[in-house]
UniProtKB/Swiss-Prot annotation:
Binds 1 zinc ion. PANTHER family: DNA GYRASE INHIBITOR YACG. Residues 65-76 have a biased composition (Acidic residues). Residues 54-76 are annotated as: Disordered. Inhibits all the catalytic activities of DNA gyrase by preventing its interaction with DNA. Acts by binding directly to the C-terminal domain of GyrB, which probably disrupts DNA binding by the gyrase. InterPro entries: DNA_gyrase_inhibitor_YacG, Znf_NHR/GATA. Interacts with GyrB. Belongs to the DNA gyrase inhibitor YacG family. One of its GO terms (molecular function) is zinc ion binding. This is DNA gyrase inhibitor YacG. NCBIfam families: PRK00418.1.
Length: 76
């Protein structure tokens, strides 16, 4: 188990550093980094755009059901 040094206020005394998912710049995880885990609002919006354009996705089984009403055979 990882133990970090703790101050009297029960918060880690050494900052936790993570890499921005977009540009890989190091970001300190804390209140001073409002866009964490991103380094800036720009990197946050780039990531959002990648999800919106379906450049990123969470793997899963495809939905092959015809219950959406968009099948090729419309019945007429």
């Amino acid at each position: 188990m990882l133990r970090l040094p703790v101050s009297q206020s029960n918060t880690p005394t050494t900052p936790i550093i993570v890499k921005c998912p977009t540009c890989k710049k190091e970001v300190e995880w804390g209140e001073q980094s409002p866009y964490r885990p991103f380094c800036t609002k720009r990197c946050q919006l780039i990531d959002l755009g990648e999800w919106a354009e379906e450049e990123k996705s969470i793997p899963g089984a495809p939905d092959l059901s015809d219950s959406d009403g968009w099948s090729d055979d419309m019945g007429y």
